[in-house]
Regions:
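Beta-propeller blade termini
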Residues: 1-6, 52-62, 107-117, 124
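Secretory pathway targeting signatures of secreted, lumenal, and periplasmic proteins
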Residues: 172-201
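Beta-propeller fold detector
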Residues: 39-46, 93-99, 154-159
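Acidic/hydrophobic-patterned starts of short beta strands in beta-sheet-rich repeat architectures
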Residues: 8-18, 61-72, 114-127
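Structural motif
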Residues: 22-31, 75-87, 129-149
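Loop/turn-rich, solvent-exposed surfaces of beta-rich toroidal or solenoidal domains
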Residues: 53-54, 62-82
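N-terminal "mature-domain start" segment
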Residues: 157-179
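Conserved blade-ending motifs and adjacent loop-strand segments that build the rim/top face
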Residues: 93-113
Length: 201
């Protein structure tokens, strides 16, 4: 559970998360204290099948109440993010549908974050850098940082994100599609190089 001001009225609400069980879908419920009594004011099934939760973050949405970003594990080791908000006093979905939510799927460990320090949360998803087949065993993976725009996901940046080293390198826009990355076979370091349909390392 978590306690925070979820609707921007300065009073704090209680968010309770329940993971998927044999008899019930994963869900989020919001409670508010009114007149000395704690009341349930909203509950939604999460469109992810979360078997466990990783974190909850709150992110700015211009002109709207904050988004509630819920990271959790679906299946064996797939991390996904459901985004909720408070609308008309109750919980509401931010992302349009389950298909949009599924686009947040990535490897465990790549948690949502405030990448730029501006209060806006982004979701890091991975794909191979240009020049690698999707099933290549030695591919270097690029991270696409997805922000929320209305009820859709919008790419706000690309980069190389190493969980092991704890570092993120953001790619300049001019590199998109023309630069890829390779692993130095001697040092294990990541190197960036020109890509024009072939990898020039």
């Amino acid at each position: 559970f978590d306690v925070a001001d979820m609707d921007g009225d300065t009073a704090k609400e209680l968010l309770v998360l329940n993971k998927t069980t044999e008899n019930a879908a994963a869900s989020a419920a919001m409670y508010r204290q009114e007149g000395g009594v704690v009341n349930l004011v909203g509950k939604l099934d999460l469109r992810t099948g979360f078997s466990e939760f990783s974190q909850v973050l709150y992110g700015k949405r211009p002109g709207e109440t904050d988004g509630i970003f819920i990271d959790g594990i679906s299946g064996t080791a797939t991390l996904q993010t459901e985004v909720l908000c408070v609308k008309d006093g109750t919980l509401a979905y931010v992302l349009a549908d389950a298909d949009t939510v599924s686009k947040t799927a990535r490897s465990a460990g790549y948690l949502s974050m405030d990448l730029m320090g501006n209060g806006e949360i982004v979701i890091p998803v991975q794909e191979p850098f240009p020049g690698y087949a999707a099933d290549a065993s030695e591919q270097v993976r690029m991270t696409r940082f997805l922000g929320v725009s209305g009820s859709a996901l919008k790419e706000v940046g690309r980069g190389y994100f190493s969980l092991n080293d704890g570092c993120i390198f953001l790619l300049p826009l001019s590199w998109y599609g023309s630069v890829t990355a390779v692993t130095d076979t001697l040092t294990g370091d990541i190197k960036f190089c020109r890509y024009d349909g072939e990898i020039h390392d």
